[in-house]
């Protein structure tokens, strides 16, 4: 077994198995170091599947719809061997060798810093729990580095699920300071990760619906899209 682990999560009906298989294919084609591929899922059927825990699920309030994607917290527990972990959302396009992420200096975990955000808007909307500067579509951590995050969610689940519209918003309020651009999480550098729907770097490179193969990864994050509406658009670009 390799010390390097690439993780994804699939639950419900938003994504079918083709997304997991495509992500696995992309990783195999774009990673020059050995790695183990794992998918946390509520419907395990493959050798690489790990059954999702459910102990946080009881805190989710469907009528509020808050704190979606909380299931990502489950992967911060010790479910697999190895010391290096890279999480990828299912709807990403990998342009370059993800070996890069396993070789980053690991004084603290890495997460997507949405450089497409206007920092003044981020600060203005901070108390409204909107316009988060962080995005959890790609996270890189070493064993034990996200344990405190999982424990904080466990210890304060009722309040956290009630308060925060998203996991990203929770990260930005508890583990990152947008005024200082620092915290217990650090953002991937400019030029690493961009958004198909939101652009790249504010304000100089904000063209949307544009592939940037000189970057590592393209995200398909877009809160304005109805769930599933962007599926065919993503598949055309695979």
Each model region followed by its residue ranges:
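Short, hydrophobic beta-strand segments that form beta-sheet elements in well-ordered domains
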Residues: 32-42, 86-88, 109-112, 181, ...
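Short, P/G- and charge-enriched loop/turn segments at secondary-structure junctions
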Residues: 62-64, 122-129, 205-206
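Catalytic core and acceptor-binding pocket of nucleotide-sugar-dependent glycosyltransferases
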Residues: 136-238
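Short beta-strand-to-loop element that shapes/binds the nucleotide-sugar donor at the catalytic cleft/hinge
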Residues: 110-140
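A short, glycine-/small-residue-rich helix N-cap motif at loop->alpha-helix starts
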Residues: 58-71
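Short, solvent-exposed loop/turn segments at secondary-structure junctions
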Residues: 11-14, 43-46, 54-58, 92-94, ...
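N-terminal anchoring/stem segment of glycosyltransferases
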Residues: 1-61, 80-81, 222-229
């Amino acid at each position: 077994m390799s010390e390097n682990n690439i993780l994804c999560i699939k639950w419900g009906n938003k994504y079918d198995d083709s997304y997991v298989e495509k992500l696995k294919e992309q990783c195999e084609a774009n990673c020059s170091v050995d790695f183990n591929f794992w998918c946390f899922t509520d419907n395990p059927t493959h050798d690489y599947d790990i059954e999702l825990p459910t102990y946080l699920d009881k805190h989710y309030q469907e009528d509020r719809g808050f704190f979606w994607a909380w299931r990502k917290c489950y992967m911060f527990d010790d479910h697999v061997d190895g010391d290096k972990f890279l999480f990828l959302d299912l709807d990403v396009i990998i342009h370059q060798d993800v070996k890069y992420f396993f070789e980053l200096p690991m004084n603290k975990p890495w997460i997507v810093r949405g450089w497409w955000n206007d920092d003044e808007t981020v600060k203005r909307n901070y108390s409204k729990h909107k316009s988060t500067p962080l995005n959890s579509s790609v996270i890189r951590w070493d064993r034990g580095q996200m344990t405190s995050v999982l424990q904080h969610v466990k210890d304060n689940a009722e309040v956290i699920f009630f308060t925060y519209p998203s996991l990203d918003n929770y990260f930005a309020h508890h583990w990152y300071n947008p005024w200082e651009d620092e915290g217990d999480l650090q953002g991937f550098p400019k030029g690493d990760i961009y958004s198909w729907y939101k652009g790249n770097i504010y304000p100089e490179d904000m063209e949307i619906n544009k592939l940037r193969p000189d970057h590592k990864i393209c995200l398909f994050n877009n809160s304005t899209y109805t769930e599933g509406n962007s599926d065919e658009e993503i598949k055309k670009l695979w």
